[in-house]
């Protein structure tokens, strides 16, 4: 395997917290008084990971593949979009190595929900749970996250050329 067979991608997403929406992160519905505003289910964590996957494979970004102007994606389950992104990355000749993600939210406390998020990620990415990491952070009451106006997610993924791994 040479260095061109391994690629990394970085993803970012942010959504506003609003009344009347469910809060879904990592495919887990989290009890809270507000949820994330968006065209789909607004799962910022899965959107950041999806974006990172597309970027790593040189396939653009989430908006290119699942535009928020397309009614077909209104209310879409982001787990379905993530699985489709994985399919497209594999079609381009890559497999997922690992993912490391951070969710930044002042409230609610996310740590109790991280195991469910990791289980969903492992299932959707087709990798072992030990290759999926999710960290929950606050912003120490600073910025829009600290004011509880929104939630941010950041992700890094590693992908590798599938046939190169088979040759080793």
From Swiss-Prot:
Superkingdom of this protein's organism: Bacteria
Cofactor binding notes: Binds 1 divalent metal cation per subunit.
Binding-site positions, 4-CDP-2-C-methyl-D-erythritol 2-phosphate: 13-15, 39-40, 61-63, 66-70, 144, 147
Record bears the keyword Metal-binding: yes
Biological-process GO terms, alphabetical: isopentenyl diphosphate biosynthetic process, methylerythritol 4-phosphate pathway; terpenoid biosynthetic process
Record Pfam families: YgbB (PF02542)
Cofactor: a divalent metal cation
Binding residues annotated for a divalent metal cation, in chain numbering: 13, 15, 47
Functional pathway: Isoprenoid biosynthesis; isopentenyl diphosphate biosynthesis via DXP pathway; isopentenyl diphosphate from 1-deoxy-D-xylulose 5-phosphate: step 4/6
Keywords attached to this entry: Isoprene biosynthesis, Lyase, Metal-binding
First-level EC class: lyase
Site, as annotated: Transition state stabilizer: 39, 138
EC identifiers of the protein: 4.6.1.12
Catalytic activity: 4-CDP-2-C-methyl-D-erythritol 2-phosphate = 2-C-methyl-D-erythritol 2,4-cyclic diphosphate + CMP
Key word Electron transport present: no
GO MF annotation: an example: metal ion binding
HAMAP family per the UniProt record, alphabetical: IspF
Binding partners and assembly: Homotrimer.
Function: Involved in the biosynthesis of isopentenyl diphosphate (IPP) and dimethylallyl diphosphate (DMAPP), two major building blocks of isoprenoid compounds. Catalyzes the conversion of 4-diphosphocytidyl-2-C-methyl-D-erythritol 2-phosphate (CDP-ME2P) to 2-C-methyl-D-erythritol 2,4-cyclodiphosphate (ME-CPP) with a corresponding release of cytidine 5-monophosphate (CMP).
Entry's family note: Belongs to the IspF family.
Cited NCBIfam families: ispF (TIGR00151)
Protein name as annotated: 2-C-methyl-D-erythritol 2,4-cyclodiphosphate synthase
Organism: Ralstonia nicotianae (strain ATCC BAA-1114 / GMI1000)
Gene name of the encoded protein: ispF
């Amino acid at each position: 395997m040479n260095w061109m067979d391994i690629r990394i991608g970085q993803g970012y997403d942010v959504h506003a917290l609003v009344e009347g929406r469910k809060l879904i992160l990592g495919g887990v519905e989290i009890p809270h008084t507000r949820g994330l505003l968006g065209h789909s289910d607004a799962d910022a964590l899965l959107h950041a990971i999806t974006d990172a996957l597309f970027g790593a494979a040189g396939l653009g970004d989430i908006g290119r593949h699942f535009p928020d102007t397309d009614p077909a994606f209104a209310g879409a389950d982001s787990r379905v979009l993530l699985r489709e992104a994985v399919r497209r990355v594999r079609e381009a000749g890559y497999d997922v190595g690992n993912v490391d993600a951070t969710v930044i939210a002042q409230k609610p406390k996310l740590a109790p929900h991280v195991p469910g998020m990791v289980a969903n990620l492992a299932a959707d990415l087709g990798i072992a749970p030990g290759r999926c990491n999710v960290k929950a952070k606050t912003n120490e009451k600073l910025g829009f996250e600290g004011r509880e106006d929104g939630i941010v997610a950041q992700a890094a993924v590693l992908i590798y050329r599938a046939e190169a791994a088979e040759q080793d």
